[in-house]
């Protein structure tokens, strides 16, 4: 298939770019360069409606995430703050998820990545379902008709490492977090990809099949990916994004709030 061929060819070209990043002596510069490599790999294959940028995410109740390597956001319909800057600020309602990029995914770096992903996944927002055709368009149902009710806007959380720890140790860290008392399992990463030695870790349901983001899962499974690690990263991302929906905040309620505040500040009666 031509798409898969193109993905594999593009992935092969990333090896030279990763080697170029080794010319940076400052680890922060090297890490930022490698984040851009992943963006440059994904960008040509993703529709323009999906934006990719580093930044932070905030919710309507005042909570805010950590700084995230790559935020996947709605680049067409949703509000984004400081869009012209290299790092943006995103309302929780405007994003699909995030990718944490690590040059070397040690266990300590995995813990940090889990923390960053959790800082997004714990942000509250209105639930979207199949009736949300666009962030601001909801399919109307007539009297007596029912629809929707499914959960279509979980936050997607992916960790990618160019090199990394063994798959058993990565699964061990995730398994320990999964078994901790009081932990919200849905705040854990959905997928972990490591290009060298080449594997994917995924949420696994009780019947052994992969779980979609937001779905129930019992443990973490894995498969060896070999040279197809980056190709599988893109295909996984594309498959998940195709099932997600967004729902904008209640702008009408915000309008009424600001309208009333303006009237009150002017000393006018508000009915």
Regions found by a protein language model. Give the residues of each.
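Intrinsically disordered, low-complexity Ser/Thr/Pro/Gly-rich regulatory segments
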Residues: 1-67, 72-271
């Amino acid at each position: 298939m031509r798409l898969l061929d193109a993905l594999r060819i593009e992935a092969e070209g990333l090896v030279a770019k990763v080697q170029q990043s080794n010319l940076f002596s400052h680890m922060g510069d090297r890490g930022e360069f490698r984040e851009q490599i992943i963006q440059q790999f994904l960008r040509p294959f993703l529709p323009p409606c999906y934006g990719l940028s580093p930044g932070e995410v905030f919710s309507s109740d005042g909570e805010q995430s950590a700084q995230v390597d790559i935020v996947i956001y709605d680049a067409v319909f949703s509000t984004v703050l400081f869009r012209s800057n290299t790092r943006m600020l995103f309302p929780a309602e405007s994003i699909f998820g995030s990718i944490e990029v690590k040059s070397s995914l040690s266990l300590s770096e995995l813990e940090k990545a889990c923390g960053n992903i959790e800082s997004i996944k714990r942000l509250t927002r209105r639930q979207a379902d199949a009736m949300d055709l666009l962030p601001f368009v909801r399919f109307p149902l007539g009297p007596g008709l029912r629809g929707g009710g499914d959960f279509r806007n979980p936050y997607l959380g992916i960790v990618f490492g160019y090199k990394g720890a063994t798959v058993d140790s990565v699964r061990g860290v995730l398994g320990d977090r999964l078994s901790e008392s009081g932990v919200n399992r849905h705040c854990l990463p959905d997928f972990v990809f490591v290009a060298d030695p080449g594997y994917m870790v995924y949420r696994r349901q009780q019947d052994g099949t992969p779980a979609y983001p937001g779905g129930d899962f019992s443990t973490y499974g894995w498969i060896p990916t070999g040279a197809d690690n980056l190709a599988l990263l893109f295909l996984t991302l594309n498959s998940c994004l195709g099932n997600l929906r967004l729902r904008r905040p209640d702008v009408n309620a915000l309008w009424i709030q600001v309208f009333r505040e303006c009237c009150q500040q002017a000393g006018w009666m508000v009915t």
